[in-house]
Amino acid sequence: MNVNNMELNLQIKSADLYICSASFESRCLAFTEGISKDSINYVAIFYNIDEVNCFDNNLQVLQQQWGKRATSIPVSYKDASNIADVFGAFFKNNFSSQRGKVLLDCTTFTHEGLLIILKYLNEYKSSYDELNIIYNCAEDYSTNTVSVNEKWLTK
């Protein structure tokens, strides 16, 4: 379902937990700009500690937008076992009691990170009532390539 920012508040009235990833792409900010901050109880912001200097302050923007509701969680995507350990600890600590609605913004997670999150969401599915997954499409994945025929990922 395609939903614009004005419709977000109607579609997603509230969530107990919002999981997102800070990145260098401004797309990581799109959802938070369109939702009422009062509708989310707790926010988990994952970020790649190996590339935090490339984020153009997007991590700080997310932290500032969500305030005390947000927790920033560093992950090293260079080490697959670190990804699994960090996400495993997060789910163990945050799904020990029942959650209501979980909202996952998968827009800027790495493939590995997203697969591990989906694994844990499946493992802990009895610990939450509802899961909504949102994604903000990129306009162009091959921004350094001019020729449409050479834009292999955007095709």
Stretch-by-stretch model annotation:
Residues 1-101, 111-155:
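Long, low-complexity, Lys/Arg-enriched
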Residues 104:
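Residue(s) in the substrate-gating loop at a strand-loop-helix junction
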